A protein has these predicted regions:
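Flexible, glycine/charged-enriched surface loops at secondary-structure junctions
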Residues: 204-213, 228-238, 253-258, 276-279, ...
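ATP/NTP phosphate-donor binding region
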Residues: 1-86, 341
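Glycine-rich phosphate/pyrophosphate-binding beta-alpha loops
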Residues: 139, 244-282, 375-379
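Short, amphipathic C-terminal "tail helix"
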Residues: 359-405
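Glycine/threonine-rich beta-strand-loop-alpha-helix active-site module
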Residues: 70-176
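Gly/Pro-rich interdomain helix-loop hinge
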Residues: 271, 275, 279-360, 403
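Carboxylate- and glycine-rich phosphate/diphosphate-binding segment that chelates Mg2+/Mn2+
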Residues: 147-253
Length: 405
C-alpha cells in the first residue's frame, strides 16, 4: 500500500501571508534565518497577523544556512520554555528544515538526533503543536514535504530526516516573499527544484499521483527559471508555484542519488573554505546521474518521456537522454553554475581551480561514496550503485568526465 501526503491547507498567491490570521491557538513561535524576512518587512507582518489572531508570539532567529544539530537543540529548548501550540517556520529551506527537527525534539524531549534520522521512524507529532511553513525561496519546497536536512558538522555530513509526520499542517506559498531572492539564490534553488521533479519522475516509488506533478513542474521550470534568474518577476512568481509542485511530487515519490551525493558532499570539504551549496551540487551532479541511471532501460524510457514533454527532439530514447543532458548543462551555463566540483569556487561560481583540492577529494572519496550509498534517498534511485560505481560517479562529478559505466 502506497501513501500520498500533503499539508492539510495550502494558501497560495500574492498576499497569502495573511492566512496567518486564520490560525487558532494561544502561542506561536516564529523560526527565521539570517534577517531577510526582517529586512523586507515580512517578519513584522507575520507577527502582526498572528497577534491579530489572538496569539502571543515569540521569535527564534538566526538559523544558519545548512542548519546544525546544535541549532536544532537550541530551538527545541526555546520551544520547551515557551510552549507554543503553533510553530511558524518562515524563510528558505534552512529555517523550515531546522524548525521541523526542533518540532520533533519539542514533542519528544528525550529523542536523540540519531533517532530522528531513522527513516519513517518518527513517533506521532501534534500533541503539543501544529506546524505552518512559509517559503521565501523557490526550490526546496520543504513547506510541503516530509523531509528535513540537518548537518552534523562534527562529521561533515548532511542527514535527511524523512517521515510523513513532519509534513507541515499548513503551507503558505506567497510569491511576494520570493521576489526578494538574490540572483544566485534563484539559480541554485531553481536547479534544486528541477532535480526534485526529474528524480521524482524516475524514482522507483513514482505513481499516478506524483507523475503529473513532476512532469508539469519540469515544464514550468524549463519555461520560467532562466528568465526568473534574469529578473522577470512574473516568471519568478511562476517558479514559486513550480517548485512547490515538484515538492509535492518528490515528498511522495522520493528522490535518488543526485540528492544522496549532494547530501554527502555538501559539508565534506567545509574545512577547505566553503560548502558545496545544495542546489549547485544538484545542478552539477544531475547530468552525470542521468547518464548513469539511463543504463537501466526503464529509467531511460522515463527520461525519454521527460525529453518529449520538454520538446527536445530525438529519434529514440538514447538520443533523447543525450539531448536532456545537453539541455541541463546549457541551463547550468545560463545560470552561471559550474559543471563539476573541480571548478566550483568558494563563492559557488565557476573558476579555474575550485576550493576542493584534488588530493583531498581523492582521499575522502571512499568514505563519501559509502555515506552516499547509505543515504535515505538512494533506495528509490532507479539504478542501485555499488561502492565502486559510486566512487567512479563521484569522480565524474569532480572532473566532468563521461559516465560510461
Amino acid at each position: 500500500m502506497a501513501r500520498f501526503t500533503l499539508p492539510r491547507d495550502l494558501y497560495h498567491g500574492k498576499g497569502a501571508l495573511e492566512a496567518l490570521k486564520s490560525l487558532t491557538g494561544k502561542k506561536a513561535i516564529i523560526c527565521v534565518g539570517g534577517g531577510s524576512m526582517k529586512k523586507f518587512g515580512f517578519l513584522d507582518r507575520a507577527v502582526s497577523y498572528l497577534k491579530e489572531a489572538g496569539m502571543e508570539v515569540q521569535i527564534f532567529e538566526g538559523i544558519e544556512p545548512d542548519p546544525s544539530v546544535e541549532t536544532v537543540m537550541r530551538g527545541a529548548e526555546a520551544m520547551l520554555a515557551f510552549e507554543p501550540d503553533w510553530i511558524i517556520a518562515m524563510g528558505g529551506g534552512s529555517p523550515i528544515d531546522a524548525a521541523k527537527a526542533m518540532w520533533i525534539k519539542y514533542e519528544y524531549p528525550e529523542i536523540t538526533f540519531e533517532d530522528m534520522c531513522k527513516v519513517f521512524g518518527i513517533p506521532p507529532l501534534r500533541k503539543k503543536a501544529h506546524f505552518c511553513a512559509i517559503s521565501s525561496t523557490s526550490g526546496t519546497a520543504t513547506e510541503v514535504t516530509a523531509f528535513s536536512i540537518i548537518t552534523d558538522y562534527s562529521k561533515g555530513i548532511k542527514y535527511p530526516i524523512a517521515d510523513f509526520e513532519i509534513t507541515p499542517d499548513v503551507a503558505i506559498v506567497d510569491p511576494d516573499l520570493a521576489e526578494t531572492m538574490p540572483k544566485k539564490l534563484v539559480a541554485h534553488t531553481g536547479m534544486d527544484a528541477m532535480t526534485h521533479a526529474i528524480e521524482a519522475y524516475v524514482s522507483t516509488a513514482h505513481c499516478d499521483y506524483t507523475d503529473p506533478l513532476a512532469i508539469f513542474a519540469i515544464k514550468m521550470i524549463q519555461n520560467d527559471l532562466v528568465e526568473s534568474y534574469n529578473g522577470d518577476m512574473a516568471k519568478r512568481d511562476s517558479m514559486h508555484n513550480a517548485q512547490c509542485l515538484a515538492g509535492m511530487a518528490f515528498s511522495n515519490a522520493l528522490l535518488g542519488i543526485v540528492h544522496s551525493m549532494a547530501h554527502k558532499t555538501g559539508a565534506a570539504f567545509a574545512d577547505y573554505g566553503a560548502h558545496i551549496i545544495h542546489g549547485a551540487a544538484n545542478a552539477m551532479y544531475l547530468p552525470k546521474v542521468i547518464a548513469f541511471n539511463a543504463k537501466d532501460p526503464t529509467a531511460k524510457a522515463r527520461y525519454g518521456v521527460i525529453a518529449d514533454y520538454m520538446g527536445l527532439g530525438g529519434a529514440n530514447d538514447d538520443e533523447k537522454v543525450e539531448l536532456l543532458i545537453k539541455y541541463l548543462r546549457k541551463m547550468n551555463d545560463d545560470l552561471n553554475i559550474p559543471h563539476c566540483i573541480q571548478h566550483y569556487g568558494a563563492d559557488s561560481y565557476p573558476t579555474e581551480q575550485g576550493f576542493v583540492p584534488e588530493e583531498v577529494f581523492l582521499e575522502r572519496l571512499p568514505e563519501i561514496a559509502k555515506n552516499a550509498i547509505g543515504d535515505a534517498c538512494t533506495g528509490s534511485n532507479p539504478r542501485q550503485p555499488s561502492q565502486e560505481e559510486m566512487e567512479k560517479l563521484l569522480k565524474c562529478c569532480y572532473y566532468d568526465t563521461e559516465v560510461d559505466f
